[in-house]
Amino acid sequence: FADLLVVILIIAAAISMFSGNTESTIVILLVLVINAILGTLQHVKAQRSLDSLRQLSSPGAKVIRDGVKLEIPSKNIVPGDIVILEAGDMIVADGRILHSYSLQVNESSLTGESANVEKTDAVIEGDVALADRANMVYSGSLVTYGRAEMLVTATGMETELGKIAGLMNAAKERKTPLQESLDKFSSRLAILIMLICAVVFCLCIYRRMTLLDSMMFAVALAVAAIPEALSSIVTIVQAFGTQKMAKENAIIKNLKAVESLGCVSVICSDKTGTLTQNKMTVQQIYIEDRLYEPDQLDLLNQTHRYLLYDAVLNNDSSIVDDKGIGDPTEYALLEMFRRIEADTSSILKEANMHEDILRQNMQRLEEVPFDSDRKLMSTKYMLHGVPTILTKGAVDVLLDRCDYVRCRDGIRPMTEAEKDKIRMKNQLFSENGLRVLSFAYKESEENLDIHAEYGYTFLGLISMVDPPREESAAAVAASKRAGIRPVMITGDHKVTAVAIARRIGIYEEGDLALTGAELNAMSDSELEEQIAEISVYARVSPENKIRIVEAWQRRGNIVSMTGDGVNDAPALKKADIGVAMGITGTEVSKDAADMILSDDNFATIIKAVANGRNVYRNIKNAILFLLSGNTAGILAVLYTSLMGLPVPFTPVHLLFINLLTDSLPALAIGMEPADDDLLKEKPRNPREGILTRGFMITMITQGLLIAAASMTAYHIGLAVSSAMASTMAFATLTLSRLFHGFNCRGSESIFRLGLTSNRYSLYAFAAGVSLLALVIFIPGLHSVFSIAALPTTALGQIVGLSLLPTVLIQIMKIIRYK
């Protein structure tokens, strides 16, 4: 529309200049410049909003500076930094690998090859191709497995990816489905407007008007009809909504997600950190067939000591300035050890067991990092002169790999009865909503890989509590009121998951809970048939998550899926709204997601859904305001044309009206705050567009009322003179459209919404009325705008007629909602 409007304005200016109307020509060109400035400012504002959101979702990095592990924004990395790479990280700089632990990287963004590439810290001789540099990693690549330390060699545009980017033009921002839908509507509307203008032009010629007057009349109609602010208003309202969401910890990565949020009908949420506080605290330790509190451990007991070795050394987290860095579960194990340190410092010193001493003196020889398929993590150390593999992980997985058990009397073969007893203890912990890890070790000279993770000696269990967030139960209840089905998906034990889900209201009597194994035994049709009854999924794999999403989608639902790991990326991509965790999430999951929760909180998703619904509602109301106002202008011009009456508006009038009403008032409507009723409605059908039959009827009805008020003023003025008629019609159409902004704030009466609840609407109205008053009351502007001086009586009639459409529309709203 912007390009079309510019062409029409240039034509209007040319006609005015050709006819000798210098003042009109200057005004039209001035409006053209103002429109261009406003359009540019709107575009710049929208672009800055999107850029700021991209900054919020940019990856961070873990570095070692002065021997201390730190987390910093990736933009602060410089050559010479040592960066720690872990599975799920996005590599943000080029670098040379110093130490590699089974590191595998996806370099498809650079090489185009999707297969994972194994990396090494070995020296490579000679000048080799980029794809063969096994001891180098590159910006834009993803760590898919393992861990490493790298020395940064290049950042920004100096990286290999940066060099490629420098050769390319920036990709054009893709439009959202709503914008594309409006573009199609705008194209059809433009054709319709041109046809109407052609018909009106022919009617004017038929009525023996001059060629210039006929062209001016047709141009005036085109200017009145074109909602030139439509596209920019939609973009700005969406950008404003995303900024508001970002302040509430929901970072939207693309505008398409804003539209989809209002349609979400199912939220598949992880448990840990999202529904719970992610503040793990060790509760009890089961070791040597007894329960202990952490401070009851006997550090001179070899079994207890080896359990602590496993908890502290087989651990990638750290504590810097009393702040945990790394996985919260591993951080809880370090916190447990620190509590023991505080209580038993002298014994620890005697046993040489202080955390800092352990970590400094014990060098990690090998490791197999944790992954969601194995559900284990293993590392190899030299303990008391013997190479020892330390392993921790899920009880049901690790217990099956244990052949021995360590007790006070030493090591002996493990019986099935002992395994059953441990499983029973795990069950009891889980029923109380506790998370349980098992620990085992073996002394071995063999190289550590996944094939070595057998023949272990069992040490014990550590149970941890991760209490539900205080707001989780209320957020779950709110989601159900909003017609959204909450579903818990977790890697935890089924009993633990059900206990937490029941406490916060996700799991109710009659609901089903499935494990990943049970899910694998079901066909797709069986899953689709039963999925509405399943509230909890436990011990699931990434493939299971994709099946769950697809089953809900086949039933016509819009699905949101949360995730934080590398393997969650496919499910996040598959979901209609992929949600990554900002605190615990890997960069791979953030890259795949549409939205990032900077607080990892389920309640934030519900707030984002409410904001998404509000953005869509505000866009719909802003479009109604623009189109109903322009409809009024079209109907007024058509009425006088068909009735053989003088032209009610000049192009300058209509340009002024559009400039006044299509900018600030429309933006103010787009900033209407959300209300509690948004989460009492059912999710919107994504297949239902804005321009529904009901919307069109409302638009035409409101346009008719405004046009009728304007034409009534026109006839009152016509009794005096055609100049008075034009002036009264112009003032009434302008003022009634400004009043109409209050009608379009919502579907309910302004008395229920509150006149002052949206201060932007008041500011826009005051600005519009002030500018209209300047035109009417400053004599020097009368000739420029081709208007007559108005007597007091006429001013009263204009105000009364301008208010009439708003009064009638408000009465209709009150009757409808009673």
Residue ranges and their predicted role:
Residues 709:
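C-terminal catalytic subdomain
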Residues 661, 706, 727-741:
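Generic alpha-helical transmembrane segments
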Residues 744:
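Hydrophobic, aromatic-rich cap/lid helix
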Residues 684-703, 723-724:
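Membrane-water interface at loop-to-transmembrane-helix junctions
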Residues 1-680, 690-691, 704, 715, ...:
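Conserved cytosolic headpiece of P-type ATPases
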